[in-house]
């Protein structure tokens, strides 16, 4: 029930008495048929039959929507990774609001896939320049499969009135009630089986029309929900002159992660519906979310006058407290004092995680890598150490500049390698960046850094395997990248290298002597030149990336690309330029790549990445210029959908006119494993895949993969077989762990 009131000028308080009428549920004599069926089933069957009609009932609409979101920290551990979290040194208390925002937007929709959101006002507690949550997400239970968020369950959840819902749910009739003369049936919804993506709760269905009046549904962890412990959804629909529309939607998440317990509420209130708007041909462009100028500059008086849901006491206090703290935190003296505390030297950071120094008043950040990843061993340099600090200065908008000087020293070959990289990011409408790098450094023959150095150090020390193959080059690299709009991005890069071959050390260290094994030469055998004399190489590379239907968020000072549901296409052209600055190479090669993630609802997710390419000409080139593929000879996996998990690193490197690769994976996301007692409690998922390489009628190599993922949320284990005609089958196990090797 709504009632608009007017407050006279100067009037601070208005007494408005009201009486809530009782909600009376009528439970008439229940007639159970010969099959012993609850009367709720007859109502549900009629609702299922009408579901497609109501799903497609509204073709387009416009509305005003108010969104309020908050996230609350309910509890936290006394310590986290050895650091005390007592309130004295941890900026929190229990039941403290971590995030609070409000927005008011005009929402325009043209079914099935056109929408536009114009944010008229936005407010974030403690961030006067911030932009709040502004994307309306109407959960339609008229859909067969409810896709709440990929992180919650990539399979989605089955609607209680889906076409096949009777196979998933039990229903119980709990009576009827009347609202404005309309008879409404209350139905309790219960999952038939645990560990299925199903809802629990109440749906209220309008008699004779068999449409939803309101819902109160919940999801629990045993419904294969990720990240959260519970999620409650409440909706109310109301009639208008043009039809029934959603009025309110509230989502209540609740969870616990590493001892941090949190809860929240996300309210959406819809008003001023128009179910017959007139849209021009160009009304829906590639900008689906736009924050109007000054949308985050509204006064408190404005918000008090338009807010449909009053602030709670804790919310009002949070606004007052954080707005005051923001003014204090903008004081340079306060920021400097805070930096002095946070920038103190930490041995754990220096050794394991890296160290960051912030100068907030000057918008400067200096980052240092962890020592553990900066010292390595290989058979070319012996022990080597790298030091690469990064200095970043932020300006207004997306403008920033970063400088990364680097120095590397090989203790056995006594070679010092200094280099530097400078980057500048800019662009008001679309993202642009320009960068230059120069100096002397080590390059892998596969310049895409196919083998992490830390991983190679472990392989060399423990297994007497020196897979890392290096050469040295004096170089200069100049690159420019830009967003072009409509899902298009472009990058061009020029690089010049003076390449120098490097031999292994005369007597590299052998830490663990393996019988019948020795270090291999520092050449990417078997597919490259036997001779690698000193030479010069000038290359020009252009990359065009396109995702059709690419959408953007438009802020007052910049546009941000958010992609689309379409596949991503990448076209790459690379030219080895002969005689430029003494360049000795002469070749042209190309590649075309397409990749996508395809949600299959309850069936899981299918991902693929396919590439074809080759050399148009290969008049003269050296090992670094070959077409290389990402292989893997370690037990830790390389990036899925990018490389071959059992393939020796340079085995099929080539200069052929044509090649193609296909990587595909099918993630069951709980399908099948939710029927296996041990797996369903652990929430482990099955995954299967195939990787294929074809090289100009000379090579056909295939890997078949079956694995288990979502182990402790972050791990994956794969069993892989590799097949090549005329060769024994390769078999191996690969483990995916949340560790980034450098």
Model regions: which residues?
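Periplasm-facing N-terminal accessory domains of Gram-negative outer-membrane beta-barrel systems
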Residues: 1-29, 33
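Structured extracytoplasmic
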Residues: 24-25, 31-184, 190-198, 258-376, ...
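Short loop/turn motifs that connect adjacent beta-strands in outer-membrane beta-barrel proteins
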Residues: 55-57, 345-348, 356-366, 379, ...
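Transmembrane beta-barrel strands of outer-membrane/channel proteins
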Residues: 65-67, 389, 405-409, 434-442, ...
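Transmembrane beta-strand segments that form the barrel wall of outer-membrane beta-barrel proteins
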Residues: 216-221, 366-377, 393, 398-422, ...
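Residues that define the transmembrane beta-barrel architecture of outer-membrane proteins
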Residues: 229, 381-385, 414-418, 472-476, ...
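Outer-membrane beta-barrel strand-turn architecture
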Residues: 393-397, 426-430, 482-486, 548-550, ...
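C-terminal outer-membrane beta-barrel translocator/porin domains of Gram-negative envelope proteins
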Residues: 433-454, 458-471, 530, 568-672
